[in-house]
Amino acid sequence: MSRHLTLCALWLLPLWACAADGTSGPRYLVEQGSRANELQIRLTMQGNPPFTLLPARQLPGSTAPISPKLVCLADNQPVTLNQPFSCQEVGWQVTLTPAPALGADASAQASLLFAPNRWLLTEWGNLVRQQGSRQGDVCLPDGSCQPLPDLNQPPLILPFGLATVPVAKRDPRLLLSHDETANQLDLPALQQQMNEIIDYLAFQLDVTPPTHPWRLVWLGRDVATRSLGGAAGDQVFVANYPTRDGKPTPQAPLRLLRTSAHEAVHILSTAPQPTWVNESLAEYLAIKALRRFRLHQVTAVNELAERGKQLPHGESGLYRAAREVMAGDRSYYPLFYVKGSSFWETLDRELQHNDATLARLLPQLGWLLPQLGWLADGRFDTASNELLAGTIGSETWRRLSRHYLGEPR
């Protein structure tokens, strides 16, 4: 996914603050409301009236669009989306969802309340946009600000008031925020491991490591929920770690690193790709990174052998899974992680046998020119099939395609 850095965007709390001037676009001020679970947002418009506000971005897959009730702060009159108005300042309220006792699902990307003055605000459904304006800043109660991402960028996710691990080195790759339960983990060591993993992933993808620190948020979630996930935002990602009875499980550090590495790939990848490619490649590179640093020796191929038959539609190929997910059947989605990661691991091994690497091959498979690498339904196009067959051998590519991708439509 593409990330465009602005001159004043120092993706770092509390160093997010950018000097405000009259040309910086609209300004969003987030303030604590009268209740702990309420935030008040004040939007100062850019330029001269008339103004028009556009709907907030919605979480992909959501069926009921969310739209806050907007009022002009000068006269308390309602403001309607997509209709011109002259009010210079508009306000609205955001209601935070209290984090469940068993922990919040990071992949749900909800706006959460952990305790008074400790919360996570996401862009989805909450931040309307001024039509025709420049990129604006979203400022938190402590005065720190972050630019509102463009529409083609990942969403804004803003943690506030959460504990943060002190930075132990110059030019860190990330800043780690976390809930209270995570204090039982060796957080400085995990933060250092993630710094090294991010550098390794950047090398694997043949991209430049982040020049400004990312924000990483770790949230515990009880294993009884049977649902642990993660989400990537704009220079920030959120990941769950497993807990039991209010304590991290022995598997928590490894799960944190793997989920965080997966989300880091989403931020490092700079070109739009089919969903199955995004998810499966991120999962494979996360597994590969853990093996590289001797944190875990599991392979994607072994995981497929152990879990493949237990998955819904385990016999389906990745092409069919991609089509079904595009049609709305997300029961095929787990195949991207398990069968998809095994596909990339097997392909990577075959490439190495032929004196090639995945890092050198990826740009030729659409990473630099995405319109040349994939068909609309997510299949490799003719040029990519020929490239892969020519690199690892026609018979090997045919066998790998048949086993993992399935027959094309």
Predicted regions and their residues:
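Extracytoplasmic/secreted envelope proteins and their assembly/folding machinery
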Residues: Q191, N195-I198, A261-H262, E279-A286, ...
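Active-site-proximal alpha-helical
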Residues: L281, E306-P408
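Second-shell loop/turn segments in exported
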Residues: H178-Q191, T243-Q251, L268-Q273, D329-Y333
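Bacterial N-terminal signal peptides that target proteins for export
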Residues: M1-C8
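N-terminal signal peptide c-region/cleavage motif recognized by signal peptidases
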Residues: P14-A19
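Non-catalytic architectural context of zinc metalloproteases
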Residues: D21-D199, F203-P210
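Acidic helix-start/capping segments at beta-turn-to-alpha-helix junctions
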Residues: W214-A224
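Zinc-dependent metallopeptidase catalytic helix centered on the HExxH motif
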Residues: V238-L311
